[in-house]
């Protein structure tokens, strides 16, 4: 391990504090209730999406004080903020009413083909079909769609806290592994696919079919486990009630923008321009829109941007730690490390090392996506789902420990799929 600079040491300490803060947001929300005079600041500190942006700002202030204005600005400009920008844009577009209408119609049509309890079938599809769809529309888009539809259907009813946490745990894990059918949808795969020459055929053979099995098993298991509660829920809101009738032309235009943004996902100058045109279109045809989720998407982008800034100073300890592992150790090491850092950062650091075996590369990426549902910071789409669903939990917050416990069983299924199949 190389000797760290003072800035790197400070960044590591701030990173640890940010992770601790992430697991303490429930406490700040509690303080907001018992100290109403300062409720505003406690609510701010209780927003998970604010955590990494806040500590990233503190890091930049340290760099400014210790190294000067030039170094602080140079470091910021050296960071790549394409992913936060993309997640912001894709969340807003995928969360529009016409897109939700379209996906709801597809899910409903598929559910009607299955002669079983329609509530359970639709729930299963939201946790299985939509995450796998993420391989083609990107994981952030799939997370946004699944979370919004779950919020408007299941989470809008009087259901148990156990079902809520179990659903979020399976959703986060399935989104993380469900994007591995293609080389462009999952952030940890995207970071290495071009350099390691991984195409769709490679992904399907080494990841895709295993991930699909794990996604199906996880969705089926949680559906079966809570089957009695589904039967007792007071008329679970039918999925068709999520959507109003939207003209086909409007749906097609929204899909057109969604596809273009996905195609140009690596070119912010293009997809941000498309997004501005999209905002103009939604303003012109406001009667076919529900309010855009701009606030939620901006908070998620702020979270990811903070992670980019803080994560950029962690290479000095993280990369040697990974490289000292063998194939088996790196799989489980990456799964565990993903819980405390972004899985795309792990695979990116791995891609900087030359001479890795193909088995090591596969194990690193498989471990990174396997652990992607354990915490809110583990996978880039997680803050989007967190932001959308948290209002339906007690004190409008998803407890990080509750998420961790709920995500462990589906994570173990993913471990079995990638290591035993």
Regions found by a protein language model. Name each.
Residues 1-9, 41-49, 70-85, 200-210, ...:
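Interfacial loop-to-helix junctions that mark the boundaries of transmembrane helices
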Residues 3, 7-32, 162-165, 169, ...:
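Juxtamembrane and boundary regions of transmembrane helices in multi-pass small-molecule transporters
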Residues 9-27, 47-65, 80-94, 145, ...:
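Hydrophobic mid-bilayer segments of alpha-helices in multi-pass membrane transport proteins
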Residues 39, 225-250, 285-295:
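Flexible interhelical linker loops that connect adjacent transmembrane helices
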Residues 60-76, 90-109, 132-144, 312-320, ...:
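Transmembrane alpha-helix boundary signature
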Residues 66-74, 100, 254-358:
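Transmembrane helical segments that form the transport core of multi-pass membrane transport proteins
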Residues 91-97, 114-118, 129-141, 173-182, ...:
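Helix-loop-helix module between adjacent transmembrane segments
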Residues 121-177, 191, 348-366, 388-411, ...:
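Hydrophobic transmembrane alpha-helices that form the pore/transport pathway of multi-pass ion
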């Amino acid at each position: 391990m190389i000797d760290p600079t003072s800035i790197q040491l400070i960044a590591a300490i701030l990173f640890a504090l940010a992770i601790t803060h992430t697991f303490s947001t429930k406490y700040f929300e509690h303080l907001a209730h018992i100290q109403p005079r300062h409720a505003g600041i406690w609510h701010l500190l209780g927003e998970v999406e604010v955590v990494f942006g806040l500590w990233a700002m503190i890091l930049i202030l340290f760099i400014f004080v210790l190294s000067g204005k030039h170094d602080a600005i140079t470091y910021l400009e050296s960071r790549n903020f394409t992913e936060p920008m993309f997640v912001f844009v894709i969340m807003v577009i995928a969360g529009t009413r016409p897109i939700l209408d379209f996906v709801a119609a597809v899910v409903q049509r598929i559910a009607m083909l299955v002669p079983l309890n329609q509530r359970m079938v639709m729930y299963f599809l939201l946790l299985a079909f939509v995450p796998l769809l993420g391989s083609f529309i990107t994981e952030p888009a799939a997370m946004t769609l699944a979370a919004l539809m779950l919020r408007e259907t299941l989470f809008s009813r009087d259901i148990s806290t156990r079902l809520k946490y179990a659903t979020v745990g399976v959703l986060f894990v399935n989104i993380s592994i469900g994007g591995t059918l293609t080389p462009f949808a999952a952030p940890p795969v995207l970071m290495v696919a071009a350099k390691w020459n991984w195409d769709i055929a490679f992904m399907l053979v080494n990841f895709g079919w295993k991930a699909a099995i794990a996604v199906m098993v996880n969705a089926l298991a949680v559906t079966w486990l809570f089957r009695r509660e589904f039967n007792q829920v007071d008329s679970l809101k039918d999925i068709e009630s999520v959507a109003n009738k939207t003209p086909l032309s409007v749906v097609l235009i929204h899909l057109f923008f969604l596809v273009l943004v996905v195609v140009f996902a690596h070119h912010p100058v293009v997809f941000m321009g498309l997004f501005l045109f999209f905002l103009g279109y939604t303003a012109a045809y406001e009667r076919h829109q529900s309010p855009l989720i701009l606030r939620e998407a901006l908070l998620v982008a702020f979270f990811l941007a903070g992670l980019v800034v803080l994560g950029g100073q962690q290479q000095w300890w993280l990369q040697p730690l990974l490289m000292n592992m063998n194939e088996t150790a790196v799989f489980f090491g990456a799964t565990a490390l993903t819980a405390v850092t972004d899985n795309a950062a792990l695979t990116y650091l791995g891609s900087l090392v030359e001479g890795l075996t193909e088995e090591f590369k596969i194990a690193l990426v498989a471990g990174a996506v396997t652990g992607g549902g354990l915490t809110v910071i583990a996978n880039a789409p997680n803050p989007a789902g967190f932001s959308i669903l948290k209002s339906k939990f007690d004190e409008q917050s998803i407890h990080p420990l509750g998420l961790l416990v709920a995500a462990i069983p589906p994570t173990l299924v993913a471990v079995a799929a990638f290591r035993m199949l």
